[in-house]
A protein has these predicted regions:
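ATP/Mg2+-dependent ligation/transfer catalytic cores
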Residues: 1-143
């Protein structure tokens, strides 16, 4: 499936990665992170050779990730997780969030991601998108 969704075509930030690597040419990998709905950071590490694909197309991410409990388990009763085959959605870098990690022995970077559903729309269960909908309702009500 094509991961360059209609929502993300204008947000591709490959140039951000290229500029970062000019300044930090010894970077060996990227920690891809997002807070779940409990505020716990969840993520993956990708080799620097996979980073361009992350910035161009996004990264497959488990749809249940934002909804994990504080122990990292899928909450009983949710339809996301093993009950529905543990489907993937896409994680796309948040503009301007790519940064070096100076405290690690190997040169690494970190980037925040936001989640996009398979339909190309912002993933409704991600806290950032929940907040965005609430703010939009307040704006619509002139509050």
């Amino acid at each position: 499936m094509e991961t360059k969704s209609r929502f993300w075509k204008e947000r591709l930030i490959v140039t951000e990665l290229k500029e970062f690597l000019k300044k930090h040419p010894n970077t060996v990998g990227v920690e891809v992170m997002m807070p779940d709905n409990n505020g716990i950071i969840r993520g993956k590490r990708v080799d620097i050779h996979e980073a361009e694909s992350l910035f161009e197309k996004g990264l497959n991410f488990c749809a249940a990730t934002p909804l994990l409990d504080s122990g990292g388990d899928v909450i009983d009763g949710l339809i996301l997780g093993s009950d529905d085959g543990d489907p993937d959605i896409f994680g796309h870098p948040v503009d301007g969030s790519l940064t070096p990690v100076p405290w690690l022995e190997k040169e690494m970077a970190q980037v925040l991601i936001t989640l996009v559903g398979r339909d190309g729309n912002p993933y409704p269960h991600e806290a950032r998108n929940v907040l965005s909908r609430v703010v939009q309702k307040l704006v619509d009500d002139d509050l």
